[in-house]
Amino acid sequence: MADAAGIATVLAADGRDFLLRNSADQVKISSIEASTVALYFSASWCPPCRRFTPKLIEAYNELVSQGKNFEVVFVSGDKDQEAFDAYFAKMPWLAVPFSDSECRAKLNKRFKVRGIPHLVILNATSGEVYTEDGVELVTVHGTEAYPFTTERINELKEQEKAAKDNQTVQSVLGTPTRDYLLSNKGDRVPISDLEGKYVGLCFVVNGYGPVVQFTSLLAKFYEKLKEVGEKFEVVAVSLDSDEELSNESFAGMPWLAIPQEDKMGEKLARYFELRGLPTLVLIGPDGKTLNNNVADIIDEHGQDAWEGFPFTAEKMEILAEKAKAKAELQTLESLLVIGDLDFVLGKDGAKVPVSELVGKTVLLYFSAKWCGPCRAFLPKLVDEYNKIKEKHNDFEIIFISSDRDQSSYDEFFSGMPWLALPLGDERKQHLSKTFRVRGIPSLVAIGADGRTVARDAKTPLTAHGADAFPFTEERLLEMERKIDEMAKGWPGKLKHELHDEHELVLTRCTTYGCDGCDEMGSSWSYRCRECDFDLHPKCALGKEEEKKGDDEAEAEADPACEGGVCRKA
């Protein structure tokens, strides 16, 4: 039975000493016999919650069937009783009544719930928190994580470390009950057939654009290595929760796959510390991991990537030299002219020859109307474009659209004072691949000589505005030095009304999102590390104080004048 000083203290409220089942039956908190209780903060409107709930149900049912003393209590974040009832109807555990909003708010505050799904696991007797990382533990380890104590979590970490130290293709790809993989025809292929070969683990999500593009490139890379006699295999690792979707994406791949029913995707994602997609983990002939992700290498070097395989330091030098030679030969026309496509569009729909842009600094602007951040960034870009054009006529921007229909393209382009590629132009795919555009909005700067000067021109333009022109490394370093001088005139710490819990510390940093104006910043931030809170110096200080720092920096840099003679200070 649950101790009154334990879980009851956490879950009870004035006038209520019970929880609910989805049948509406009341269950006395004091009657809970579980020794381990999980508080599940979730809501039906949250897609990640809807994806995680079936995993928690599966783990819960398995633990209950094994006779484990485990209970879950749903703490809803739904917006109304109807949504709560529909969502809770699928759950086999208990819940705090939706009507007890005070208790739900208290629990959210007590356990500092900043996002959902969130699973806090407690000792039912003492109320001690075992872990607040229940979602990750259930996702990765399932029932093996029970009873979720620190000791058990440490055991799992030790097992994982031992597995990595003694890693083989069988330990990575197999299970105690399965020693085979599947071909795209459904044939079973023994994992032992991969021993002594290089193996690439390709994490896939059906229909996800960057993965679809990469797997198309990987297929050519795979076939080329086969052609030259390399012992190389690819194994697809699906991250889809839907078996039908997983099978659909695998059907068009020429390699092997882990059976979807084993649900190993998220476990392997954590094992290999997956950071994003696309990802191709490279395992050597001895079964040990050589590289946690070679997808960027293949993506960057395209059809030449096979010459760098298996991407040792020596092989990478070969690829780097080839890439350098290719970059030296790059011109604006080599980027923007493919066959008869030797033009861009002007505002009146007129075709502007690419040759007329040669000798100018050109920003390639990857964007789309459907993209919220793109719409938010556009006014800033238009403003800075006009400022640059006032001083530099040798400058232009080309809009490269990811819009899905002509009307959206036309409407979005109508608000831009620059040029564009036609919607659906084949050069878009070529340019996106060349510059590895992973998201939008994105700005790539091409110098007057036709060579790339900045793959990310958005960050310096956001930070420095028109002063970032012409986006060369020398110019950006000059701007950084100027800002560093300005920062010498700013206070090292301050308190601000937007974050009065802690002091904000002036911190040198890369890029960040300002919690004051919601715009991006770089170089310097007033930051609270404890709360992951950032403010632009201009938001923290106000423009006058920031300018004061600017004035002080300029005063230090100006010559000192005395007696009619100016000398360097």
UniProtKB/Swiss-Prot annotation:
Enzyme class: oxidoreductase
InterPro entries, per database record: C1-like_sf (IPR046349), DC1 (IPR004146), Nucleoredoxin-like (IPR052259), Thioredoxin-like_fold (IPR012336), Thioredoxin-like_sf (IPR036249), Thioredoxin_CS (IPR017937), Thioredoxin_domain (IPR013766), TryX_NRX_thioredoxin_dom (IPR045870)
Listed Low complexity bias regions: 560-569
Keywords: NAD, Oxidoreductase, Repeat
Reactions catalysed, as given in the entry: [protein]-dithiol + NAD(+) = [protein]-disulfide + NADH + H(+); [protein]-dithiol + NADP(+) = [protein]-disulfide + NADPH + H(+)
PROSITE patterns registered for this protein in UniProt: THIOREDOXIN_1, THIOREDOXIN_2
Residue span of region Disordered: 544-569
Domain Thioredoxin: 1-158, 171-315, 321-488
Xref: Pfam families: C1_2 (PF03107), Thioredoxin_8 (PF13905)
Family: Belongs to the nucleoredoxin family.
The protein, known as: Probable nucleoredoxin 1-1
Lineage: Eukaryota, Viridiplantae, Streptophyta, Embryophyta, Tracheophyta
GO molecular function terms noted in the UniProt entry: thioredoxin-disulfide reductase (NADPH) activity
PANTHER family according to UniProt: THIOREDOXIN, THIOREDOXIN DOMAIN-CONTAINING PROTEIN
Xref: Gene3D superfamilies: Glutaredoxin
Natural source organism: Oryza sativa subsp. japonica
E.C. designation(s): 1.8.1.8
Functional summary from the UniProt entry: Probable thiol-disulfide oxidoreductase that may participate in various redox reactions.
